[in-house]
């Protein structure tokens, strides 16, 4: 196989999130594919555009961690409630409305905090606190907000009993838009090969 690899940041592919990942793309050597990774876009999408319309009708998970099962006015618009670890509180976890999100991780307890809250106050190295008097504004992003940031469409519904499973499914996914641009580049690279043309012609014959 001819192997191509490159680190890509999802924020360069119309994903409202800082998310750096290394992608490996392999092609059979006999295809002689000269693959080029997509270049991306200069414009970044801020949180205000991604989740600005989801500020209301959000629910806290039952008992802090269980799904509200059919009672969310907006599907999956529920967030994990509960304490924050010392590791979580070691740095700021809030991005402003005009910024892209932190990386959406697979763990519910590591979900970024909602941009309605002010950035966390620096106390000393590896220690931050919520701004006094504004504590009520700090909450984790909801499952739906994380899905939006991962660019899943709103009609893609996640099913789970424990809300941690919802965060895990979303956090482990490749952002939808980034996957699209990668897949498009792969398709365009393959379209010139005889193998791909032969497959397309056979598929076309089935429809005639």
Where are these regions (language model features)?
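Conserved S-adenosyl-L-methionine
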Residues: 1-12
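S-adenosyl-L-methionine-dependent DNA methyltransferase catalytic core
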Residues: 17, 21-208
């Amino acid at each position: 196989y001819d192997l191509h690899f490159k680190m890509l940041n999802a924020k360069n592919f119309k994903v409202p999130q800082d998310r750096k990942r290394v992608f490996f793309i392999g092609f059979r050597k006999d295809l002689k594919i000269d693959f080029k990774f997509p270049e991306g876009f200069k414009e970044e999408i801020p949180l205000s555009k991604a989740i600005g319309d989801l500020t209301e009708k959000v629910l806290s998970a039952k008992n802090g961690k269980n799904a509200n099962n059919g009672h969310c006015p907006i599907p999956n618009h529920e967030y994990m409630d509960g304490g924050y670890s010392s590791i979580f509180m070691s740095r700021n976890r809030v991005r402003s409305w005009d910024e892209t999100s932190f990386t959406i991780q697979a763990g519910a307890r590591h979900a970024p905090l909602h941009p309605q809250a002010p950035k966390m106050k620096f106390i000393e190295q590896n220690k931050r606190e919520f701004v006094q008097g504004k504590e009520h504004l700090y909450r984790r992003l909801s499952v739906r907000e994380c899905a939006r940031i991962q660019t899943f469409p709103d009609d893609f519904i996640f099913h789970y009993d424990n809300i941690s499973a919802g965060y895990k499914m979303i956090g482990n996914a490749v952002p939808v838009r980034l996957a699209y641009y990668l897949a498009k580049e792969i398709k365009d690279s393959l379209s010139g090969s005889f193998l791909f043309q032969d497959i397309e012609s056979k598929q076309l014959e089935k429809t005639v």
